A protein has these predicted regions:
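Intrinsically disordered, low-complexity polar/charged tails and linkers
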Residues: 2-215, 219
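Broad, structure-driven detector of short, well-ordered beta-strand segments within folded domains
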Residues: 220-224
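Long, well-ordered mid-to-C-terminal structural blocks that present hydrophobic/aromatic surfaces
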Residues: 227-228
């Protein structure tokens, strides 16, 4: 994921998060923020300095905590009001109490703090629904059917096979496959590494290089209607 915060580098959006929830989200990264002159001592009901915080987020470097990058990226993806109902359903299913005056972004922050995997998995499912260009492969025997019930639910063996393949191609392991069933189709979201990169970067005032392995997400679609 690129080190970009887009909307969360805007102080007006940061202010939409309740100070208590924002402080809880930032607490694990207190030292990183304090080293850059940002104080979390206020917290509670008192407003944080969102202008200073936005300034820090707008200039990430290699010392920026990856957990903070991931958290803000996921929360931002669910900050619009159109996501409130699905966030509410997830919160209630998790046994969380939701107040009458809960805002969408506050609920997203609370859910992430409660169980980050809930929002991360939901975001992967949404990626499955995006329109893409596919290469199509039809059944060798069009008369044969596709037995959906015979498809495995446990994708761990598939992930292990993919790990061996990607590792042999110098793309690293730790692949992740997420299955999503829909009307007349089944989608598999495949997340895996790519070849490593080294790019020029800045560490404070010093010129340096950042070495990292990019991530790629592929979608495999099983079309039950057209058998391809």
């Amino acid at each position: 994921m690129p080190l970009q915060f887009k909307s969360f580098a805007r102080p007006d959006l940061l202010k939409t998060i309740h100070p208590k929830h924002l402080a809880n989200l930032l607490e694990p990264h207190r030292r990183f923020l304090e080293d850059r002159g940002f104080s979390l001592s206020a917290g509670g009901e008192q407003e944080l300095d969102c202008l200073a915080l936005a300034g820090i987020l707008a200039q990430p470097d290699e010392e920026t905590p990856s957990d903070l990058v991931e958290a803000l990226y996921v929360i931002e993806s669910f900050s619009d009001d159109q996501h409130f109902d699905e966030l509410l359903a997830m919160a209630e299913a998790s046994g969380m109490e939701v107040g009458e005056e809960e805002t969408t972004v506050d609920l997203a922050v609370r859910l992430y703090l409660h169980d980050a995997n809930l929002l991360e998995r939901k975001l992967r499912e949404q990626l499955c629904d995006r329109r893409r260009t596919f290469e199509s492969y039809r059944l060798a025997d069009p008369a044969s059917g596709i037995e959906v019930d015979n498809l495995p639910r446990d994708l761990t063996p598939l992930e292990a096979d993919l790990d061996r393949y990607f590792e042999s191609k110098k793309r690293g392991g730790h692949s992740c496959v997420v299955r999503k069933d829909a009307a007349n189709e089944i989608r598999f979201l495949v997340q895996h590494g790519q070849t490593c990169k080294r790019e020029p970067s800045r560490k404070g005032g010093r010129s340096t290089c950042t070495f990292f392995r990019p991530e790629k997400t592929d979608v495999v679609l099983l079309d039950l209607t057209h058998k391809e």
